[in-house]
A protein has these predicted regions:
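Bacterial N-terminal signal peptides
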Residues: 9-18
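Carbohydrate-recognition beta-sandwich/jelly-roll modules
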Residues: 29-419, 439-447, 451-453, 566, ...
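N-terminal Sec signal peptide cleavage junction
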Residues: 20-22
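Aromatic- and acidic-residue-enriched carbohydrate-binding clefts of CAZyme catalytic domains
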Residues: 379-391, 463-497, 536-544
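Active-site-proximal substrate-binding groove within the catalytic cores of carbohydrate-active enzymes
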Residues: 55-60, 202-234, 281-283, 288, ...
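Active-site-adjacent beta->alpha loops and helix N-cap segments on the catalytic face
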Residues: 429-436
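Glycine-rich, aromatic-flanked loop segments that form ligand/cofactor-binding clefts
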Residues: 268-269, 436-488, 565-575
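Bacterial N-terminal signal peptides that target proteins for export
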Residues: 1-7
């Protein structure tokens, strides 16, 4: 098949356009319900209804014919023993006694239904279909179009040949592109489904499904659709299927339940780092030198020695330099990290050290230190420390950290960033600095913490508060056991994975504790909950299935939504599409966990960075700009192999962006290309900011926001209704959002002529009716 045939006649259109830009807040009225219903109704026309099929039960080879053209869509497998063959006018069925399954094929109005019914009482794996095509359209991340002979993809699948569909695919389908048509295999879900990739003589796949013995659902359903070789037809057919299954919920429907969701429309995705309440600007270093022998500093060392993950050795080593008036950058960082660290400790209060607490601290002590909420405990510790250090050594407490937090947010709003999601790396960042959270809320921003219920650690340090729970029974009684009887290790091999079905009371306890003092958090981000790390738990005391796991995750999403939170989750795989509003990780997923040059070799130019920042700002893992190897570009970033499958389905349902490890600026030499794709795909830009990075990136972030916010406000009012290639090399691409909003991105190295408009390389043209705006990324790289 020649994909150049897909090139649309849009390239030949002569359009009359003016130079008016998309600037300022959107004043466009939302389209009527009738308009959006019309956009949905077109989906009915994509699947071919006039088709025939032929199946060989022994090999399960399946052929489909339409318009006199036949393709083998499921390749023959090793012959199986069959029994109970029956054929009627509408159905063919048989059983495979050795595999303990019954198979039924039925031709429906617009698809072929294949039902595989498991009869085994124990775990049972059945493989089908085996697919071999010239090209594959797969929902890997946002979407990929993969030729069967592309060298980098072959190398990738050679090293990653076992594919867990629940984790690897963002949606529950896969498509093959053959000479005459595309065939799309749609599943109810991808629970317990895998693919094995073969790379010789070219790329092919075989899918299998494991029926879990204790799972009450014994049926695997495929709905097989025929469409043109067009990603729009494939995606819209899948969208129609999801709507029919009642598994589709628009942002408008979600906002009816929680109006705060409207703040996400047009919002930049900003991870905001303020890990220090007490900053270098807040300390009077020369005055400190004379006070360094005071008991409080000895007490801080004792706390670090007893409770700190790294002990007190480094802290003790810098005290003599501070006393000598030689508090340089290193000494200041160690000192500030130590003081901010102990502010988190429940054990910080010591009546022998803090003999004269101020009024606020005294009232909190009277309540009982062990009865305080987490926010109250932080408030107590701050007042104890500030009162003991005094204003001779530090600025007044109310000024601590504000220059690096509230002042930055104020400047963001003043500079023209009208809509933003502000993500905090942990809820403690908000509870330690509630003024900053209030400032974000007052500015009309969404603000909320990163949270995780993936893992639990036994005796977790305060650094791992997401892996720590007050309930002492969870580690033994609520963790996941695999089929072999082993506990599944937690993140980075620490602790264990939690069973989501067993911890809902603990979720409520954590959330209630965080919100106990009415801190104005209005968003919540859930790590891993839409990333496909879903499990069957074989523990005989609490056997649960992947379906149970997903239901439990949706339950906690719905709980947070009921509290007025705008809920987001990692990646955005669509089993969670009804529960989340936004997702991070779909547009740029985590790139190559397994490459040591990126993950272990700190001398490599590709090393992505460290999790910790010695200066309390953004860890280098998130703000260090690094190149990626050429072999990874076709897999992760090359627009030649990317297709907006997810956006064609969920543009009006889930707002998706990059994984936080790979924000819009992270990849050296690709910031401009990725920005073009952000507009083309309606993907919010993401950036990690602290005080210093805000000053560094301010001009570019603000300038981009002036166009981005009104653009997305309009784009979210419609389906993504079309995606097309405008050039023979497929490097000039167009997306349409309804009838009056389009984006044309030029990823090539030559000018592209669209009617009277010249679109230079490295630019994108936004077309809104007769108005155009040029997005020029040619100077965005630093």
């Amino acid at each position: 098949m020649n994909f150049k045939k897909i090139v649309t006649s849009l390239a030949l259109l002569s359009l009359t356009m003016t130079g008016c830009g998309i600037t300022g807040q959107s004043k466009t009225n939302k389209p009527s319900l009738k308009v959006t219903e019309q956009e949905f109704s077109k989906n009915k026309s994509y699947a071919k209804k006039d088709f025939d099929y032929k199946v060989d039960p022994e090999t399960f080879q399946l052929s489909l014919t339409t318009n006199g053209k036949t393709e083998i869509v499921a390749q023959p497998q090793q012959p199986r023993k069959i029994a109970d063959y029956q054929e009627t006018a509408s159905e063919i069925s048989w059983s495979c006694p050795d595999e303990h399954v019954e198979i039924t094929l039925k031709k429906e109005k617009d698809h072929l239904a294949v039902k595989i019914l498991n009869q085994a009482k124990k775990d049972n794996t059945f493989s089908w279909p085996k697919i071999d095509a010239e090209n594959y359209t797969l929902p890997i991340a946002e979407g990929k179009s993969i030729p069967n002979n592309q060298p980098e993809w072959l190398k990738y699948f050679l090293g990653n040949n076992e594919i867990d569909l629940l984790e690897a695919f963002s949606m529950s389908f896969f498509s093959i592109n053959q000479s005459n048509f595309a065939t799309t295999f749609v599943l109810d879900n991808t629970f317990n489904s895998q693919m094995i990739a073969t790379t010789e003589p070219h790329l092919s796949f075989e899918t299998s499904h494991t029926f879990v013995g204790f799972d009450p659902n014994k049926t695997l359903n495929y709905r097989i659709y025929l469409t043109d070789n067009d990603p729009v037809a494939i995606a819209k057919t899948y969208q129609k299927d999801r709507v029919a299954l009642d598994k589709f919920k628009t942002l408008e429907q979600k906002a009816q339940e929680n109006p705060e969701i409207n703040k996400m429309n047009g919002a930049l995705q900003i991870y905001f780092w303020n890990n220090r309440l007490l900053t270098s600007d807040d300390v009077k270093w020369q005055a400190l030198a004379a006070e360094i022998d005071e008991p409080i500093f000895k007490w801080i060392g004792e706390l670090l020695a007893k409770y700190g993950e790294d002990g007190d050795e480094e802290y003790q080593s810098i005290l003599p330099a501070i006393k000598a008036g030689e508090a340089y950058k290193y000494e200041q960082n160690v000192f500030l990290n130590s003081l901010n660290y102990v502010l988190l400790y429940p054990e910080f209060y010591n009546s022998d050290i803090f003999t004269k607490p101020d009024e606020v601290a005294s009232k909190l002590i009277e309540k009982g230190v062990d009865k305080l909420t987490e926010q109250e405990r932080y408030t107590l510790n701050q007042h104890l420390m500030a009162g003991t250090l005094g204003t001779d050594v530090t600025k007044p407490l109310e000024q601590w950290g504000q220059k690096a937090s509230t002042d930055v947010l104020t400047d963001m709003k003043k500079s023209g960033i009208n809509k933003a999601w502000i993500g905090l790396p942990n809820w403690e960042n908000g509870l330690m600095n509630p003024k900053m959270v209030a400032e974000a809320n007052d500015k009309g921003y969404l603000v909320g913490p990163y949270d995780s219920y993936q893992s639990i650690q036994e005796d977790a340090s305060i650094d791992w508060n997401t892996a720590s729970f007050p309930n002492p029974t969870l580690y033994e009684d609520a963790t996941i056991t695999n089929k072999k009887g082993d506990k599944i290790p937690g993140f980075l091999g620490k602790g264990r994975k939690l069973n989501s079905t067993l911890i809902f009371p603990d979720v409520k306890e954590r959330v209630t504790g965080i919100l106990a003092n009415n801190i104005p958090i209005n968003s919540w981000f859930l790590d891993t909950d839409a990333a496909g790390e879903i499990y069957n738990d074989y523990d005989p005391t609490h056997k649960t299935t992947q379906a149970d796991d997903v239901d439990a995750r949706l339950k906690r999403m719905n709980y947070l939504n009921s509290l007025g939170m705008v809920v987001g989750a990692e990646t955005g795989n669509d089993f969670a599409s009804e529960g989340m509003v936004y997702a991070h990780g779909l547009e740029t997923p985590v790139i190559m966990w397994s490459d040591p040059d990126m993950r272990q070799n700190k001398e490599s130019e590709y090393y992505v960075g460290d999790y910790a920042a010695v200066d309390g700002g953004i860890p280098s893992k998130y703000n260090k700009v690094v190149p990626i190897k050429d072999e990874y570009k076709p897999i992760y970033t090359d627009p030649l192999y990317s297709v907006p499958l997810y956006k064609l389905v969920y543009n009006r349902s889930v707002i998706t962006s990059h994984h936080w490890e790979w924000d819009s600026y992270k990849i050296k030499g690709l910031t401009g290309q990725r920005r073009l794709q952000e507009y083309l795909y309606n993907t919010p830009p993401m950036v990690h900011l602290d005080q210093a990075t805000w000053q560094d990136r301010k001009e570019d972030v603000v300038q981009n926001a002036k166009t981005w916010t009104p653009f997305q406000e309009k784009a979210l009012q419609h389906e993504m209704t079309n995606f097309s290639y405008l050039s023979e090399d497929r490097l000039v691409q167009r997306t349409d959002f309804g009838a009056d909003l389009s984006v044309v991105a030029n990823f090539s190295k030559t000018d592209f002529q669209l009617g009277k408009e010249t679109i230079p390389p490295g630019t994108a043209l936004i077309i809104e009716g007769t108005k155009t705006t040029l997005i020029d990324t040619r100077t965005v790289e630093k």
